[in-house]
Amino acid sequence: MASLRKIHPLMKITNDMVIDLPAPSNISVWWNFGSLLGLCLFSQILTGLFLAMHYTSDISTAFSSVVHTCRDVNYGWFIRSLHANGASFFFICIYLHIARGLYYGSYLYKETWTIGVVLLGLVMATAFVGYVLPWGQMSFWGATVITNLLSAIPYVGGTLVQWIWGGFSVDNATLTRFFTFHFLLPFIIAAATLVHLLFLHETGSNNPTGLNSDADKVSFHPYFSYKDLLGFLALLSALTSLALFSPNLLGDPDNFIPANPLVTPPHIKPEWYFLFAYAILRSIPNKLGGVLALLFSILVLVLVPILHTSKQRGLMFRPLTQTLFWTLVADMLILTWIGGMPVEYPFVIIGQVASTLYFLLFLVLAPTAGWLENKSLKWL
């Protein structure tokens, strides 16, 4: 008789996804980040639920309710620290997951990749509205500046901003709706993640060589389930260490000051994981141009499969495109650094050069390198 996990309607789905799933035998540690993102999402939803029990979405009490959670709730300080730093780990895993997809050509699974880009947008939206909730100085001014960018949209911009604010400025209505979105979006992300997995399991996983691995598959459990557990252990150790030893390392000191609409912070900036996009936004002197550049800095990922010109899938045997990939990594780090700097010389010009290079790498240099590599294969 067949095992229950293979015939029960619900257990069969789980079995096909995480137990008897055929996986390429040579996938490396870079394939761990998908499961780590699942762990991050679960951790964020869990800690977020406990924080929501003690939070009040009213401008007069929001800041105090966060202070109350940290001071008076049992282990409230730890839960908040895990949640705030968990967001940073979430984005570290996302960026590494995308980098692996770019390096090994996983973007050629177009449906999986497109849903992944949608997931990135949803996670960014969730993190942005979540950053507003403590109602500190940087929360308030970050919300004001970023939502105000929508006013650059012709004809409907002004109306759209007022509609999002729920009035003529960032106020109580804004905080209430941002809390609603922050509570709702993680569950939408969880649903989109299932769609992401559904599309992935239609094709099966890619592997480091970029070659067909049908002849060399192993079952997901126990080989990769234990490998994922080791990743879980490493991530949770790093997260708890940061939350316990240096919980405010990645935060902004201005957010310890309650929001004051009459005092502007000397330098408004988002959390570190948005700095690269913020640097691209600031590099364009025109408001609408900056908003479009910000939007396309994420949407350019959708074009990657379309602009793939190489006959080979990954970058394992493509030294020219490998060089461009590591140039992109360096460029992202430079943009992240520039996003945290004041708007003055020489940071402005460095940001503009780095932003131009960012788009050139995706739209021009990578497709050209792929074409040149195809040509070079004929010369060998």
Curated annotation (Swiss-Prot):
Q: Name one Pfam family in it.
A: Cytochrome_B
| Parts of the chain that traverse the membrane | 33-53, 77-98, 113-133, 178-198, 226-246, 288-308, 320-340, 347-367
Membrane topology summary: Multi-pass membrane protein
Q: What cofactor does its activity depend on?
A: heme b
Q: Which GO terms describe its molecular function?
A: metal ion binding; ubiquinol-cytochrome-c reductase activity
Q: Can the keyword Signal be found in this entry's annotation?
A: no
What are the recorded Gene Ontology BP terms? mitochondrial electron transport, ubiquinol to cytochrome c
Compartment(s)? Mitochondrion inner membrane
Tell me which residues bind heme b b562: H83, H182
Task: Provide the Gene Ontology terms for cellular component.
Answer: mitochondrial inner membrane; respiratory chain complex III
Which superkingdom does the taxonomy of this entry point to?
Eukaryota
Entry's cofactor comment: Binds 2 heme b groups non-covalently.
Residues binding a ubiquinone are H201
Q: Which UniProt keywords apply?
A: Electron transport, Heme, Iron, Membrane, Metal-binding, Mitochondrion, Mitochondrion inner membrane, Respiratory chain, Transmembrane, Transmembrane helix, Transport, Ubiquinone
Instruction: Explain the purpose of this protein.
Output: Component of the ubiquinol-cytochrome c reductase complex (complex III or cytochrome b-c1 complex) that is part of the mitochondrial respiratory chain. The b-c1 complex mediates electron transfer from ubiquinol to cytochrome c. Contributes to the generation of a proton gradient across the mitochondrial membrane that is then used for ATP synthesis.
Q: What else is known?
A: Heme 1 (or BL or b562) is low-potential and absorbs at about 562 nm, and heme 2 (or BH or b566) is high-potential and absorbs at about 566 nm.
The Swiss-Prot or TrEMBL record describes its family as follows:
Belongs to the cytochrome b family.
How it assembles, according to the record, is: The cytochrome bc1 complex contains 3 respiratory subunits (MT-CYB, CYC1 and UQCRFS1), 2 core proteins (UQCRC1 and UQCRC2) and probably 6 low-molecular weight proteins.
Q: What is the name listed in the Swiss-Prot or TrEMBL entry for this protein?
A: Cytochrome b
Query: Which species is the source of this protein?
Result: Lampris guttatus (Opah)
Q: What is the lineage of its organism?
A: Eukaryota, Metazoa, Chordata, Craniata, Vertebrata
